[in-house]
Amino acid sequence: MNKKLIIAAALCLLPGVSFAQAEKKDSTVFTVVKENPITPVKDQNQSGTCWAYSSLGFLESELLRMGKGEHDLCESFLVYHTYMDRADKAIRTHGDVSFSQGGSFYDAIYCLKNYGIVPQDAMPAPGTPYGDSLFNFNQLSNVTTAYVEAIAKSNAKKINPVWKKDLNSMYENYFGKLPEKFTYKGKEYTPQSYAKSLGLN
């Protein structure tokens, strides 16, 4: 009996011991060896565009590192082109290519090389074309995904090329019109000439 009582008492004390260990403070101290400059963190809100924000954030940090000053690159421009390209691939492969909000760093590099890039000021601020203060793709994603899938999985022998104009209009309503030319810091650019001026490769 005494043996059982001692074991029970010991078991009751175990949570107290583990609790005391949990309260131990971590004494690890980190020393900053080199702190790289970064641009402010932006809010993607209700959109699956973390890839666009992180990719352009990295490129903005690279510009700072290269001594090119602070730039605020436009996620809307990148996302617009990426989604249009992805829709084209999904339709050409009859839906065998994923058409979703996600993306990767490669999409940013591809956009930079093929379409250029623009500063944030060259397009409306995220969400403003539809009365929000930030991106909200809940409705956009549902509509565009259904539209692209309907065309991609269609049994039509020939796809009417008007689909691109329709999809382009949907994106224009959410992102604003893609600029052909814009003025930035007193100089006129196209998206391609602006990208070239940044010196990213």
Regions found by a protein language model. Name each.
Residues 1-23:
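Bacterial Sec-dependent N-terminal signal peptides
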Residues 22-201:
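Catalytic-core signature of thiol
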